[in-house]
């Protein structure tokens, strides 16, 4: 069960979203900074990571001299103060990430070193599924002092980190033996995560908005959708494994009812063997119907794409909203895909209709993408495509 205290915090957060000026009550849900600070020691000269805007779209990184900083490919925006600047690349957990995420791009980082203080801007400009940067992604900063471990989920979650002798980023392929024997199989975390431990700064990225929720004690629990968890911390990997319990939403089986009368064979069946076979056959089809209905409700009504994790404190978790976006690229891809273009034919003028249709559609892409309203496309026999706004038909 989720404690009333967590419900109160989440409800207060929902009020602050609607009316930010009216909600003055302090909450454990971090909104602006979205930065988990662990009282970094003053005698440690490290880099400084901070978010430039409240939406977390871009981050500023102040790098001390001769301290390497690693930034994910395509995420570097700008560098200020270019005195004796050195740029190279670094593969982070190449083989483990390749096996786990089936992608080598998640391991490629640009390594930057300067002889003076550098001011760097970084943003999540990497491509996802062959599509350009998704503006719904936002950043969050983790400041580690070595007292706790962080598990960060997702192949593209780590955007930047400072490379020092203390900070360690691991990507285990198989769960550790200690986590396996800690509890039952229900306590296992999703396997696709990376472990952060030691001291240093790490810039992570999540879908939609990113919020930090603090669970105060062991009685403080929360139920989180597995797709929405970005990171979780703990005293050790064993502590994190023991704090998470996997819970799936079970669908109640369909009520079959009293089938004692239904399995009775008709009077014209005299043979006892046939009567028994008839009863077993009827019962089999009833159970099969119940199973099909159960699977249908589980897959199409309740959904099986995700499961829930019950997490108990004390610890801090990062939640990503995973805002659902209806990208215009999906519509444009369907319009220009080969399946929507007929085979090449030649008209009376010898013009290739397929190329003409493709060129006509491409000429309207910019206009179509910049207008939020709906359009009606009219395709004439000669291959011309005419787009008209629905406002003209009202």
From Swiss-Prot:
Q: Name one Pfam family in it.
A: AIM24
Q: What is the first-listed, main subcellular location in coarse terms?
A: mitochondrion
Task: Give the matching InterPro entries.
Answer: AIM24, AIM24_sf
List UniProt keywords, sorted A-Z. Answer: Mitochondrion, Transit peptide
Protein name, entry field: Altered inheritance of mitochondria protein 24, mitochondrial
Question: What does the entry list under GO cellular component?
Answer: mitochondrial inner membrane
Question: What subcellular locations does the record give?
Answer: Mitochondrion
Q: Indicate the residues annotated as transit peptide.
A: 1-111
Q: Which gene encodes it?
A: AIM24
According to the record, the signal peptide region is none
Which protein family is named in the record?
Answer: Belongs to the AIM24 family.
- PANTHER family recorded: ALTERED INHERITANCE OF MITOCHONDRIA PROTEIN 24, MITOCHONDRIAL
Kindly state a single biological-process term from the GO annotations of this entry: inner mitochondrial membrane organization
Q: Which domain of life is it from?
A: Eukaryota
């Amino acid at each position: 069960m989720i404690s009333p205290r967590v419900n109160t915090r989440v409800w207060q957060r929902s009020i602050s979203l609607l009316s930010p000026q009216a909600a003055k009550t302090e909450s454990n849900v971090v909104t602006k900074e979205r930065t988990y600070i662990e009282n970094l020691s003053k005698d440690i000269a490290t880099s400084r990571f901070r978010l430039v805007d409240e939406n977390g779209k871009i981050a500023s990184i102040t790098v001390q001299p001769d301290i390497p900083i690693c930034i994910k490919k395509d995420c570097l925006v700008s560098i200020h103060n270019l005195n004796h600047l050195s740029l190279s690349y670094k593969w982070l957990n190449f083989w483990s990430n390749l096996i786990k995420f089936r992608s080598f791009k998640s391991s490629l980082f640009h390594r930057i070193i300067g002889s003076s203080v550098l001011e760097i801007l970084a943003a999540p400009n990497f491509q996802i599924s062959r599509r350009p940067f998704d503006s719904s992604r936002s950043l969050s900063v983790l400041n580690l002092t070595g007292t706790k471990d962080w598990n960060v989920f997702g192949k593209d979650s780590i955007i930047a980190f400072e490379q020092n002798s203390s900070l360690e980023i691991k990507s285990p392929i198989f769960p550790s033996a200690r986590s396996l024997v800690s509890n039952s199989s229900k306590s296992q975390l999703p396997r696709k995560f990376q472990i952060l431990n030691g001291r240093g700064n790490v810039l992570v990225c999540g879908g939609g908005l990113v919020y930090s929720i603090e669970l105060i004690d062991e009685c403080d629990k929360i139920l989180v959708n597995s797709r929405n968890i970005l990171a979780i911390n703990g005293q050790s990997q064993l502590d994190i494994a023991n704090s998470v319990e996997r819970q799936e939403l079970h669908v109640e089986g369909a009520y079959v009812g009293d089938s004692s009368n239904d399995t009775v064979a008709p009077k014209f069946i005299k043979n006892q063997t046939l009567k028994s076979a008839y009863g077993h056959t009827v019962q089999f089809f009833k159970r099969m119907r119940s199973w099909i209905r159960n699977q249908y409700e589980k897959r199409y009504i309740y959904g099986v794409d995700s499961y829930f994790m019950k997490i108990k404190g004390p610890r801090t978790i990062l939640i990503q909203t995973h805002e659902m976006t209806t990208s215009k690229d999906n519509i444009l891809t369907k319009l220009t895909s080969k399946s929507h273009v007929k085979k090449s034919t030649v008209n009376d003028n010898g013009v290739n209709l397929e190329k003409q249709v493709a060129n006509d559609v491409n000429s309207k892409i910019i206009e179509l993408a910049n207008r939020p309203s709906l359009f009606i496309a009219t395709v004439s026999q000669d291959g011309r495509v005419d787009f008209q706004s629905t406002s003209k038909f009202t």
